[in-house]
Amino acid sequence: MNLQKISKKIDFKKGAGLIPTIIQDFCSGEVLMLAYMNKESLEKTIETNTTWFWSRSREELWNKGATSGHFQYVKSIHIDCDGDTLLIKVEQLGPACHTGNRSCFYTTLI
């Protein structure tokens, strides 16, 4: 499937051009992080086979692992039933979280 066909399946309008993207470990199923993608970051993710996101605070694209070396290699990309959320299954090199934890979801509330 080409990039145009993929982009047409995704509703970027609901979130002002951004869609929440869940990153999950391909082998274990562990949820590693949540980030946001725009159309350009999704295209770069598909082209490079590594995850790219839109930083809402810095207002720029970023390639996960470009600074730390903790790249996420894309194994599969899934879309939810409403077309407004992505699930990307990855092979994670090193920790996913900037704190050094494997997952960003390391704090238990209940």
From Swiss-Prot:
Residue numbers binding Mg(2+): D80, D82, D84
Top-level class of the enzyme under EC nomenclature: hydrolase
Annotated EC: 3.5.4.19
This protein's GO CC annotations: cytoplasm
InterPro entries reported for this sequence: PRA-CH, PRib_AMP_CycHydrolase_dom, PRib_AMP_CycHydrolase_sf
A GO BP entry: L-histidine biosynthetic process
Keywords noted in UniProt: Amino-acid biosynthesis, Cytoplasm, Histidine biosynthesis, Hydrolase, Magnesium, Metal-binding, Zinc
Subcellular location as annotated: Cytoplasm
Catalytic activity: 1-(5-phospho-beta-D-ribosyl)-5'-AMP + H2O = 1-(5-phospho-beta-D-ribosyl)-5-[(5-phospho-beta-D-ribosylamino)methylideneamino]imidazole-4-carboxamide
Statement: the UniProt record of this protein carries the keyword Hydrolase: yes
Cofactor note: Binds 1 Mg(2+) ion per subunit. Binds 1 zinc ion per subunit.
NCBIfam families recorded: PRK00051.1
UniProt name for this protein: Phosphoribosyl-AMP cyclohydrolase
GO molecular-function terms, A-Z: magnesium ion binding; phosphoribosyl-AMP cyclohydrolase activity; zinc ion binding
Xref: PANTHER family: HISTIDINE BIOSYNTHESIS BIFUNCTIONAL PROTEIN, HISTIDINE BIOSYNTHESIS BIFUNCTIONAL PROTEIN HIS7
